[in-house]
Design a protein with these regions (language model features):
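Glycine-rich phosphate-binding loop of actin/hexokinase-like ATP-binding domains
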Residues: 1-51
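ATP-binding/phosphotransfer module of carbohydrate and carboxylate kinases, centering on a glycine-rich
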Residues: 11, 34-40, 44-174
Length: 174
């Protein structure tokens, strides 16, 4: 999920895989192949969320264009109107996402990678460079892993959380 942050989940045999510490699929704080120290909200640098989330793309546009930071939706509108800086920022974020996902796929060999969240709604301008970078970076047959947009769009994380709650029968007591 690409939005205000970066999130992920792994399923194995149709079941959500939590991992030994409950953090399986946490992609936000994977290191990214960038030059420079880009600060992350966690206090460290060069994490995926710091360079490819919606706020990161908006901040990068502001830095490159020399303008105040504006919402990602404004950057996307500029991209659609042909702004070369906006197009480059989105493409660069897609490329970094694709490279990191190639590493994740090399480790876990998934059948499919589903991309959702608000920033994923940018569409082909983000997903095309993501897919291209993934195909170049991934090894062997992993490079052919299907990369699909989430069918539920921006609702995917909410539906996933609700399904998790239902599956684990979380009870709320007053």
């Amino acid at each position: 999920s690409i939005g205000t942050g970066i999130g992920g989940a792994l399923t194995v045999g149709g079941q959500l895989y939590h991992g030994a510490h409950g953090t399986a699929g946490e992609l936000a704080h994977l290191l990214v192949p960038v030059s420079g120290a880009i600060g992350c909200g966690c206090g460290r640098t060069d994490h995926l969320e710091a360079v490819a989330s919606g706020p990161a793309m908006a901040a990068e546009y502001a830095a490159r264009a020399g303008v105040p930071t504006q919402p990602l939706q404004a950057v996307v509108a500029l991209m659609h109107s042909g702004d070369p800086i906006a197009r480059a920022v989105v493409a660069d974020a897609g490329t970094l996402l694709g490279r990191v996902l190639a590493g994740v796929a090399t480790a876990f060999d998934p059948e499919v990678i589903v991309i959702g969240g608000g920033a994923a709604q940018i569409g082909a301008d983000l997903l095309s460079p993501l897919t291209s970078a993934f195909r170049v970076e991934a090894m062997g047959p992993i490079a052919e892993t299907a990369i699909l947009p989430a069918r539920l769009g921006t609702d995917a994380p909410l539906v996933g959380a609700a399904l998790l709650a239902a599956a684990t029968r979380i009870e709320i007591t007053p």
